[in-house]
C-alpha cells in the first residue's frame, strides 16, 4: 500500500519506517529498557507495546486517548465553565457611559457591515488550527501532542473571549459609528445634562457600547497566535540554521490576524486603540496557554509537549533502576542534514532512531 507523504515534510515518514524495520530488535530489548508500571497515563498489555510507549508514534488515540482525557478531566470541566461564563457575559448589559455632543465628532463614521463576518471568526481561529493538529497527529501518532494542542488552543480562545467580553461590558466605550446607531435618522437628541437620548434599535445601540477591546482581533490572535507558536515548534523555526522559509510559515497566521484587526478599523467598528489592545490581549493569552503544555519554540525540545518528555524520563529512571543500558532521550539535531527537506522545512522526528539508522546504513 502506498505511503502518504507531504512534499514539504519528506523526512517525517522516516521514523515510522525505522520503527517498522527494527521491530524484532526493539521487541527483544523491550523488557530491559522500560517498565510500564511507572510510566504515567499508560496501561500497556504486551512486550512490543511497552517498548513503543516511550517512542514517538506509540501513544495513539485508541491506546491512550481516554486515559489522557480522564487525567485532564478537571481541565475540561473548567473549559465548560468558561463556555458558560462567556454565554453569561454575552447576555449582560454593557455600561452606558456618558456621550456628549462634543464627542460625536469622533463617533459619526458611517455604519458599515463587517468585512470579516462574525461567524467566520471561530472557523479560522479554532477549526483551522484543529485541522492542522489532526493532520500532524496522523503523521506522528502522538496523542499527547494532539490532546495538549487542542486543550491549549481552546483555553487560549475561551480565556481571551471571557476577558474580552468582560472588559467590553465594564468599559462601555462607544464605537466610531455610534452616532448612526443612536440616531439612525440623523436627528440628534440630548438630555439636560448633555447626554444622548438614543431612539435607534436597542440591540444596535447596545452593540455600539462594546468597542474596547476588539473581539475579532483578540480572537484572531489567540487562535492564530497559538497556531503560530505550535508550528514554530514543530518545524524548529529557531534552530539556528537560517531557513527563512520557516519564518514565513510562522508569520503567516499572525499576518492574517493583523489584517483582521485592520479591517475592524476600516469598517469603523473599532478605534485603533481597541484593535491594538485586542491583539495584545490575544497574543499574550495564547503565549501563556502554549507554554503550559509545550516548551518554548526555540528550545531543542520545542517540537514535542512536556508530557511526552515526562514519559521518556520516567522510562529512563525506571530503566536505570533496573540496571538496563539506556538510550539517550530524543533531542533535536541542530546540525545540517543532507535530507533537510524543501528549504529546510520538515516536521522534527525522533533523532534517536535516526542516528541508529544512520549507523546501520553507513551514513553515521
Swiss-Prot record:
Known InterPro entries for this protein?
Answer: P_Acid_Pase_2/haloperoxi_sf, P_Acid_Pase_2/haloperoxidase, PA_PP_rel
Example of a GO cellular component annotation carried by this entry: plasma membrane
Q: Which GO MF terms does the UniProt record name? A: phosphatidate phosphatase activity
**What GO terms describe the biological role, i.e. biological process, of this protein?**
phospholipid metabolic process
Q: List the disulfide bonds.
A: none
Recite the UniProt keywords alphabetically.
Chloroplast, Hydrolase, Membrane, Plastid, Transit peptide, Transmembrane, Transmembrane helix
A single Pfam family, by name? PAP2
Q: Where is it chiefly localized? A: plastid
Q: Does the keyword section mention Transit peptide?
A: yes
Read off the SUPFAM superfamilies from this record.
Acid phosphatase/Vanadium-dependent haloperoxidase
- Which principal EC class is assigned to this enzyme? hydrolase
* Enzyme Commission no: 3.1.3.-
**Annotated compartments:** Plastid, Chloroplast membrane
Looking at the UniProt entry, the stretches that span the membrane are: 76-96, 118-138, 143-163, 211-231, 242-262, 275-295
Q: Which domain of life is it from?
A: Eukaryota
Answer whether the UniProt record assigns the keyword Transit peptide to this protein.
yes
- Membrane disposition: Multi-pass membrane protein
Q: Which family does it belong to?
A: Belongs to the PA-phosphatase related phosphoesterase family.
Tell me the PANTHER family matching this sequence.
LIPID PHOSPHATE PHOSPHATASE (PTHR10165), LIPID PHOSPHATE PHOSPHATASE 3, CHLOROPLASTIC-RELATED (PTHR10165:SF203)
The name under which this protein is listed is: Putative lipid phosphate phosphatase 3, chloroplastic
**Source organism:** Arabidopsis thaliana
Amino acid at each position: 500500500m502506498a505511503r502518504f507523504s507531504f512534499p514539504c515534510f519528506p523526512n517525517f515518514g522516516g521514523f515510522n519506517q525505522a520503527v517498522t524495520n527494527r521491530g524484532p530488535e526493539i521487541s527483544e530489548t523491550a523488557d530491559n529498557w522500560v517498565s510500564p508500571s511507572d510510566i504515567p497515563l499508560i496501561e500497556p498489555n504486551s512486550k512490543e507495546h511497552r517498548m513503543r510507549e516511550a517512542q514517538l508514534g506509540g501513544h495513539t488515540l485508541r491506546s491512550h486517548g481516554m486515559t489522557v482525557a480522564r487525567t485532564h478531566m478537571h481541565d475540561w470541566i473548567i473549559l465548560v465553565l468558561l463556555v458558560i461564563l462567556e454565554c453569561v457575559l454575552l447576555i449582560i448589559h454593557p455600561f452606558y457611559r456618558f456621550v456628549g455632543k462634543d464627542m460625536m465628532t469622533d463617533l459619526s463614521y458611517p455604519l458599515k457591515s463587517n468585512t470579516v463576518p462574525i461567524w467566520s471568526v471561530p472557523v479560522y481561529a479554532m477549526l483551522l488550527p484543529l485541522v492542522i493538529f489532526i493532520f500532524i497527529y496522523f503523521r506522528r501518532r502522538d496523542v499527547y501532542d494532539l490532546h495538549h494542542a487542542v486543550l491549549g488552543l481552546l483555553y487560549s480562545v475561551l480565556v481571551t473571549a471571557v476577558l474580552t467580553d468582560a472588559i467590553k461590558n465594564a468599559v462601555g466605550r462607544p464605537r466610531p459609528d455610534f452616532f448612526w446607531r443612536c440616531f439612525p435618522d440623523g436627528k440628534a437628541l440630548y438630555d439636560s445634562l448633555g447626554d444622548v437620548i438614543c431612539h435607534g434599535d436597542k440591540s444596535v445601540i447596545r452593540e455600539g457600547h462594546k468597542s474596547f477591546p476588539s473581539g475579532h482581533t483578540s480572537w484572531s490572535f489567540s487562535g492564530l497566535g497559538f497556531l503560530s507558536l505550535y508550528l514554530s515548534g514543530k518545524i524548529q523555526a529557531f534552530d539556528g540554521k537560517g531557513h527563512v522559509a520557516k519564518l514565513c510559515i510562522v508569520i503567516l497566521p499572525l499576518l492574517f490576524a493583523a489584517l483582521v484587526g485592520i479591517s475592524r478599523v476600516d469598517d469603523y467598528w473599532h478605534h485603533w486603540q481597541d484593535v491594538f489592545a485586542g491583539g495584545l490581549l490575544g497574543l499574550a493569552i495564547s503565549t501563556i496557554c502554549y507554554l503550559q503544555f509545550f516548551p518554548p519554540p526555540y528550545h531543542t525540545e520545542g517540537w514535542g509537549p512536556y508530557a511526552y518528555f515526562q514519559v521518556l524520563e520516567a522510562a529512563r529512571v525506571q530503566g536505570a533502576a533496573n540496571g538496563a543500558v539506556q538510550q539517550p532521550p530524543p533531542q533535536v539535531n541542530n546540525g545540517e542534514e543532507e535530507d533537510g527537506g524543501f528549504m529546510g522545512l520538515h516536521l522534527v522526528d525522533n533523532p534517536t532512531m535516526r542516528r541508529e539508522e544512520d549507523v546501520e546504513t553507513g551514513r553515521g
